[in-house]
Structure formats: structure tokens, C-alpha cells
Amino acid sequence: QWRHVMEQGLPNAGKVHVARNAAAVYDLLSGREVPFEKRDGRIIVPVNFSTNDGRIFLVADRRIASLAVECPRSIKRGSGFPFRVSLRDSDGKTLRMPVPLKIKLATATGRNLFEDYAATDEKGELEKKINIPLNLDAGTATFSIKELASGGKISVIVSLE
């Protein structure tokens, strides 16, 4: 390998050991849950690297079951659009952990009004307000949230008045 540039990298495999228990482990770069095993109060996550890639894992005490969003169903042009997002477990309880989100608001014609990345706070919630342009045509818009841990999505159709 001396004096060779390995642009594509070399295959590599191993195991990540984390000294804690968990109900789920998520790969934030691929947006999915990954398999792991529990042993002696720790979790072991197998990893395979085909090139020079990497992983960012989110270790969760409870599995993400759904997204919940609270927002108005109509937006007055030129005003703010407040919303609140939370992650829920299978019992409907809020997951108190930070999780990255992709937030998007687009008109029915496909015009992006807002697109951003944010994360829930330590309480498992995100509250935000989007400013809506005054010069929009009346119609509908799709407000969508994707959580980047398990890949779950939720969309709400709102009217632009």
C-alpha cells in the first residue's frame, strides 16, 4: 500500500461497543434503525465500511414509533406559521431526547417556502415559527417533517389565505 492513493478506501468491518442499555440504535446518516446485541449491560453494534465512509449512531432508551405535529391548518399570508413537533414511542409518550429533523413547507405548485434542518430539544420537542411571504397566491401548501433517525415522516396540508 506504500505510495498508493486509496481514493475508494478499503473494506473494513468491526463492532462498536457502548457501555449502556438501549431499546434502539439508529444510523443518522442512513436514516434507519440498525441491529445490535445486548451483552453485560452494554450494546454491540456491528459496522461495515465499504469505503472511507463513517457512521453517526443515536442510542435510544425507547424506540421511535411516530411523529406528532401541532400547527394551524390555515396560514394568513404575511404572518407567522407556528408549529410544534414531538417524537412519540409506541405508548404515545414523548421521547425526551434530541433527534434531527428536516422541515419543509412547499406550495401546491412545488415552490419551496421554507426548508431547514433542526432538532428536538432534551424534552423531545421543537417549537418554531416560519415567516410566510405576503406576496403568495392563495391556495394550499404541504408542511412536512422527516425525522432523520428512523426516517419517519408526517405531512399536513394547510391553506394559504
Please report, for each region that a protein language model flagged, where it lies by residue.
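Short, aromatic- and glycine-rich surface loops/edge beta-strands on solvent-exposed regions
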Residues: 54-59, 137-149
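Edge beta-strands of extracellular beta-sandwich domains
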Residues: 67-71, 116, 151-161
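Carbohydrate-binding surfaces of carbohydrate-active enzymes
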Residues: 1-82, 86-90, 95-101
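Conserved aromatic beta-strand anchor motif in extracellular beta-sandwich/beta-rich domains
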Residues: 27, 103-107, 145
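Short, surface-exposed loop/turn segments at beta-strand-coil junctions that are enriched for proline
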Residues: 131-137
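Aromatic sugar-binding surface patches on proteins
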Residues: 41, 121-130
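Beta-strand-rich extracellular modules
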Residues: 88, 131, 146-150
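Short amphipathic beta-strand segments in non-cytosolic proteins
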Residues: 32, 101-117
